[in-house]
Design a protein with these regions (language model features):
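Short, hydrophobic alpha-helical segments
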Residues: 200-205
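Short active-site neighborhood of thiol/selenol oxidoreductases, capturing the structured segment around
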Residues: 61-91
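Solvent-exposed coil/turn segments that connect beta secondary-structure elements
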Residues: 77-78, 111-116, 140-142, 152-153, ...
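N-terminal targeting signals for export/organelle localization
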Residues: 1-49, 206
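Thiol/disulfide oxidoreductase modules built on the thioredoxin-like
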Residues: 143-199
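Structural microenvironment flanking redox-active thiols in thiol-disulfide oxidoreductases
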Residues: 86-147
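Short, acidic, Ser/Thr-enriched surface-loop or helix-capping motifs
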Residues: 55-56, 178
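Hydrophobic beta-strand anchors of alpha/beta hydrolase catalytic cores
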Residues: 72-73, 108, 174
Length: 206
């Protein structure tokens, strides 16, 4: 392995490690928030994602559905009380800012880490409240693992006495994938529509 390749791998690994540390904790009284990094992180070398196969209201969703267009990707769940609605509202504003601009308008993909409760019907209804064009997908843990592991995403479900009433801790990073389906940038919180739109224009510029 030559020095340039080694350096690129180290930089890509550092980006994923930074993104993976942004973990959001819900419903855990007295448990401190982990320190989260701030500011966008553009990938020095764009990371190709492994093959994955998820599904959603529109049918199967795989790597081929990332090809040919830019994609903002976010992991969460529909019963998330704050972070997910905030992120999706932010993405609605980002899309509004990019409408009519020379750069192509990216697709927004919401990956649910709560497949037991987030049915296709619920995902469709939930996302339509923000933007009907948003794509909702999910899968069991085995199906989620390739994509989550590649991006450094962490999530953990917390059981309760009611098997269908529980919270989920999950990473709060918004990822940007290029038209080749590679990781181009990661945006840990705090996120603002102005920064995301500006970084997208910069990265998507010819």
């Amino acid at each position: 392995m030559n020095a340039k390749v080694a350096k690129a791998l180290v930089l890509a690994g550092a980006l994923l490690a930074l993104a993976g540390t942004a973990l959001v904790w819900h419903g855990l009284p007295g448990r401190p928030l982990p320190q989260e990094p701030s500011g966008p992180s553009a990938a020095a070398t764009r990371l190709s994602l492994p093959a994955f196969a998820l599904h959603g209201p529109r049918g199967a969703f795989a790597n081929t559905d990332l090809a040919g267009r830019w994609t903002f990707l976010f992991f969460g769940y529909t019963r998330c009380p704050d972070i997910c609605p905030t992120a999706l509202s932010l993405m609605t504003e980002v899309k509004g800012r990019l409408a009519g601009a020379p750069a192509p308008v990216p697709q927004v993909v919401f990956v649910s880490v709560d497949p037991l409760r987030d049915t296709n019907a619920l995902l469709a209804e939930y996302l339509a409240a923000f933007d009907a064009s948003f794509v909702g997908v999910s899968g069991d843990d085995a199906a989620l693992a390739p994509l989550a592991k590649a991006l450094g995403v962490r999530y953990e479900r917390h059981d309760s006495r009611d098997a269908r009433n529980y919270t989920v801790d999950h990473s709060a990073v918004i990822y940007l994938l290029d038209p080749q389906g590679r990781l181009a940038a990661a945006f840990p919180p705090p996120q603002t529509p102005g920064v995301l739109a500006a970084e997208f224009r910069r990265l998507a510029a010819p």
